[in-house]
Amino acid sequence: VNTTPEPAVDVPDVSVVPVIELPLPPPGTMGPPKEYQRLRQECPLARVRLPIGATAWYATRYDDVKELVADARLIRPSITDWPPRPGHAPGDEPGLVTMMELEGPRHAALRRALSEPFSVRSVRSGMPRIRRSADRLLDPFVAGDQPGDLVVRFIEPFPVMVMCDLVGIPYEDSDYFLPRADAALGAILTLEEGREATSQLREYITSLLDRKRREPGDDMLTRLVGECDRGALDHESAVNFGLSMLVAGYRTSTMFLADAVLTLLSVPGAYARLRDHRALLPGAVEELLRYVPVMNGVVVLQAVEDIELHGRTIRAGDAVLPVLAAANRDESVFTDPDGLDLCRADNPHLTFGRGAHNCIGSHLARAQMTVCLEALFDRLPDLRLAEDHRPIWEDESPSKSPLTLPVNW
């Protein structure tokens, strides 16, 4: 008789799921965190403690992330309503509600109003405008002293300039709205500053919409004013879109561009290969969007009803982080997922999400990266990392890009 005990069957129970610290990229790198592969294999739905003290479910497998980001039982909470704070009820403070948090008919109406300006056709026709913004920044950079800081002088202001031009926000106002956007995004930690900054940004967007009504332009805000005036869109949704652009319309692009350029300059021969073989660029952009691990648990969703996954119960009210960057490195989907393959043929990355809240600016993001790289190849063909100068990183953030990038050319 075999007396060897049978292995215990793992029946996970939410009450005993250990809480781990939020995985962070290794210091001085863009990442991704080393824990991703182990979590995908051993604990695809983990519990993590965020730097703000709250806990959340943390999904790292491609198939799970793909389903969760499109699951109607998960919504985007306002950053001023989540995580819950003692003595603070949802909605009792001026919320920073952006396009990402809108649901139902209001969200659908805003998406319809913006479908044309964010379409492939419109973005393609706008690429000369994007290139002019790149050249406007590169002209003084190329003429300047070496080494130069490519992030501070080009990559950081470039998406802001593009966003301002296309949306209809005066670029010269960036000194006003950028610090307030930082404060509004910090509302989770500093409620008073966040509340004041949010109020100021709302007033700024409202006044800008009024100005577009008096002085129409060739931009998205003017288009939304027209939609409001004919009753197809409510004023608050137009304000929400404006807030989206001020606080999120350029930040992720900046990080992707900085990490992408650093990657091409760090992988031997990659920059020169794309410079000399421009036909590879469309596929290379998709590979960089997959490879660059910016989306490290920055998408926070909240369950509106119970969800069962991997034998565990995500309760209504629980926060869920579908980790897009982890999904994009899933070895069950991508061959050599941790390698950069500029000719990768099959690349179903999830960087832009999917479902009702997939990134409406995905075509614009691709165009920005394409124009950014083309401009660098044309203007700085011998671009290289400066010797004895290392990029500076903000190592406490789950989403990282170099704050500085010293280069020679």
Where are these regions (language model features)?
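Cytochrome P450
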Residues: 1-409
